[in-house]
């Protein structure tokens, strides 16, 4: 009866594990940060809800107008030592960190155009007066908001609250640790 000795090439095993875990960490990190948009807040040790919106414009979901911000989250670096996930939209750092923006003449022009767009959509009655329907009240609220924004003075400041969606997360690190231990256990069972 022959004895079979199982030999393991540890260098090869280490390289495979490092490559696989870096790829797994990148995929899971991107998925975790995109999930912030679904949950409406960032999870470090617990969910930190985003500040509510003050604008009547936009849809029901906060920070999800076109989905461009969420879709811009991607891995930018993946090595055995580290994984970097970032967003490349010009306004992502303003939302993630919060900040203050200055009103410009171009912004005022935009808000006036929005005001005229919403104010012109209201429906009238047969006598030419403005209807008091729920749709008109919604449009009037949007038009009034746009007018308030358009009437702000050039140079005045608008505070954008922090709505973090990317950052250090203990929950993410714990999940990556759990998956790494599972991957190592699977590797040793199969080799």
Which stretches of residues belong to each language-model region?
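Short, Lys/Arg-rich flexible segments
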Residues: 1-191
């Amino acid at each position: 009866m022959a004895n079979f000795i199982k030999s393991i090439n540890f260098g090869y095993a280490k390289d495979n594990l490092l490559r696989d875990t870096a790829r797994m960490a990148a995929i899971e990190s991107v998925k975790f940060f995109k999930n912030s948009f679904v949950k409406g807040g960032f999870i470090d040790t617990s969910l930190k809800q985003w500040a509510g919106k003050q604008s009547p414009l936009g849809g029901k979901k906060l920070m999800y107008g076109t989905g461009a911000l969420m879709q811009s989250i991607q891995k930018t670096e993946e090595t055995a030592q580290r994984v970097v996930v970032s967003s490349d939209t010009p306004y992502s750092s303003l939302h993630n960190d919060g900040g203050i923006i200055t009103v410009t003449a171009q912004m005022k022009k935009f808000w006036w155009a929005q005001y005229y767009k919403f104010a012109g959509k209201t429906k009238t009655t047969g006598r030419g007066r403005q209807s008091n329907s729920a749709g008109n009240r919604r449009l009037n609220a949007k038009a009034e908001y746009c007018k308030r924004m358009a009437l702000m003075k050039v140079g005045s400041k608008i505070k954008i609250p922090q709505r973090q969606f990317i950052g250090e997360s203990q929950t993410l690190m714990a999940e990556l640790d759990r998956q790494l231990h599972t991957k190592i256990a699977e590797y040793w069972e199969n080799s």
